[in-house]
């Protein structure tokens, strides 16, 4: 990747009249904004269908797209919906935040109407899509249909052990027949999602904009991935996890973080040549040009917590697959570019794995000015092969960080970067990242808008109020694009 910059902006954060960002007009408008601002990367969060809690990192599938992102106006233009069928529905009352409850109530009934009109009309195109995605689509569509049948509960709670444990091909076929309409619905929704996505991605490529996407290291227990291939995970003979994921206690959390995802059966995966991971990254390559590997340090060693624990305190470190896996992925996908999210617990082993892989790691400016210790996040310590962020989706926007950080940290930032009121605090921090030698610089959209309190994307460790922030219509102005472009060109990005 040549020297460039981009903006972190989740799809759900785009403005739209239907309560959540979609792949429609606002996505194309944002692409135009990026182009006008001289940005060559759009970083997104995972695009999969979300579960309770709405986290894109806990998805029902590592391959499927979120039906919430299917643009309804495009379906109206395509003759699949009538305007009257969507305009009077309650999509939420606050344009700044997503109301997932309201969207859940309204969205699928509308999409069912689109499927009823389009399933037969588009049968040849749908059949081709099914053939291209035969490795994951049948399992995903059946999984979602079964979830509906069993009250949207996770597969681990389904009463029928035959389908819960996938005891025979005959059982799967019986449920496909029983739930045929829902299987068709979830198949068709993926057809619509990918049709709209491919069109948007082609448009972005026409503007010389690359898509950076996240690959969460773990998948959700409540997912088609685990249900369909339980042998790839650390589960017992009743498909109950033996240990689950998390991170140990640290300076910020005395109990650590209990994520609860099933852990991989790395020995079995390696014996299979890491085929599961090859298929997964191949699926991600149909969405993204650059893949950020979340929690990269888990490839070196991961924190395993006994199943049933209520905190992560009693976990232990287990050696991960390391270069055995990373080498396979970079070898199989030479055209893909990867970013290693190497934040947290930078042990010598993690640093060595990053060096051996050749992948760029991450530098976060908000971590640079902690006056308690010298920091490798300070721009003067960067090498070219890294990605500099103002902050990630898990961090406060700069304007909020300024209010939350220790006064001595802010004083250090002011001195180090020569911050002044005329330029503005946010823009001075952005200048620090833009001017660094890091090959790629990424800022959150909130940082360019100088938004602080109530504008976080996510607060780790909390269960509500996350993944809701949205851009308002008219905030991404031509004047803002010109200012971003001026700084981008000044620093050769």
Spans of features found by a protein language model:
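Surface-exposed amphipathic alpha-helices with a cationic face
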Residues: 35, 197-205, 330, 354-355
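C-terminal accessory segments of extracellular proteins
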Residues: 479-493
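Outer-envelope exported proteins of Gram-negative bacteria
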Residues: 45, 210-212, 216, 290, ...
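Trp/Phe/Arg-rich N-terminal binding region typifying the photolyase-homology
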Residues: 1-80
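Short alpha-helical segments and helix-capping/turn motifs at coil-helix boundaries
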Residues: 25-32, 195-203, 277-279, 425-429
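Alpha-amylase-like alpha-glycosidases and glucanotransferases acting on alpha-linked glucans and related
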Residues: 10, 54-194, 219-442, 446-453, ...
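Conserved, well-ordered alpha-helix/loop/beta-strand core segments that scaffold catalytic motifs
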Residues: 186-219
């Amino acid at each position: 990747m040549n020297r460039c910059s981009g903006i972190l902006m989740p799809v759900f954060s785009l403005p739209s009249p239907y309560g959540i960002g979609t792949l429609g007009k606002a996505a194309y408008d944002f692409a135009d904004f990026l182009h006008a601002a001289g940005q060559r990367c759009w970083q997104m969060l995972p695009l999969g269908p979300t579960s309770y809690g709405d986290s894109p990192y806990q998805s029902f599938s590592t391959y499927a797209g979120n039906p919430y992102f299917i643009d309804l106006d495009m379906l109206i233009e395509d003759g699949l919906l009538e305007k009257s069928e969507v305009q009077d529905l309650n999509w939420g009352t606050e344009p700044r935040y997503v109301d997932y409850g309201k969207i859940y109530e309204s969205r699928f009934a509308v999409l069912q109407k689109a499927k009823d009109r389009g399933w037969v009309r588009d049968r040849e195109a749908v059949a081709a899509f099914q053939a291209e995605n035969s490795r994951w689509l049948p399992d995903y569509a059946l999984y979602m249909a079964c979830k509906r049948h069993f009250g949207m509960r996770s597969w681990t709670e389904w009463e029928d052990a035959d389908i819960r444990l996938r005891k025979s091909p005959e059982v799967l076929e019986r449920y496909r027949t029983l739930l045929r309409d829902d299987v068709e619905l979830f198949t068709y929704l993926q057809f619509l999602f990918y049709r709209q996505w491919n069109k948007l991605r082609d448009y972005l490529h026409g503007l010389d904009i690359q898509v950076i996407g996240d690959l969460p290291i773990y998948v959700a227990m409540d997912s088609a991935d685990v249900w369909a291939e339980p042998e790839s995970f650390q589960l017992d003979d009743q498909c109950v996890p033996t240990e689950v994921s998390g991170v140990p206690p640290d300076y910020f959390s005395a109990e650590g973080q209990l994520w609860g995802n099933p852990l991989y059966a790395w020995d079995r995966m390696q014996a299979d040549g890491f085929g599961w991971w090859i298929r997964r990254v191949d699926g991600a390559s149909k969405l993204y040009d650059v893949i950020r590997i979340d929690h990269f340090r888990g490839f070196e060693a991961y924190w395993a917590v006994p199943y049933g624990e209520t905190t992560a305190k009693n976990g232990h470190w287990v050696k991960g697959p390391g270069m055995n896996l990373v080498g396979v992925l970079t070898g199989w996908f030479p055209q893909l570019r990867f970013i290693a999210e190497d934040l947290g617990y930078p042990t010598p082993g993690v640093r060595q794995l990053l060096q051996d892989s050749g992948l760029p790691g991450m530098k976060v400016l908000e971590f640079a000015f902690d006056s308690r210790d010298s920091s490798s996040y300070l721009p003067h310590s960067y090498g070219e092969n890294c990605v500099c962020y103002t902050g990630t989706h898990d961090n406060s926007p700069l304007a909020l960080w300024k209010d939350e950080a220790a006064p001595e940290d802010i004083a250090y930032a002011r001195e180090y970067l020569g911050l002044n009121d005329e330029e503005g605090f946010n823009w001075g921090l952005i200048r620090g990242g833009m001017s660094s030698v890091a090959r790629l610089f990424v800022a959150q959209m909130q940082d360019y808008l100088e938004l602080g309190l109530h504008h976080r994307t996510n607060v780790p460790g909390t269960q509500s109020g996350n993944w809701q922030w949205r851009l308002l219509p008219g905030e991404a102005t031509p004047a803002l694009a010109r200012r971003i472009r001026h700084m981008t060109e000044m620093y050769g990005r």
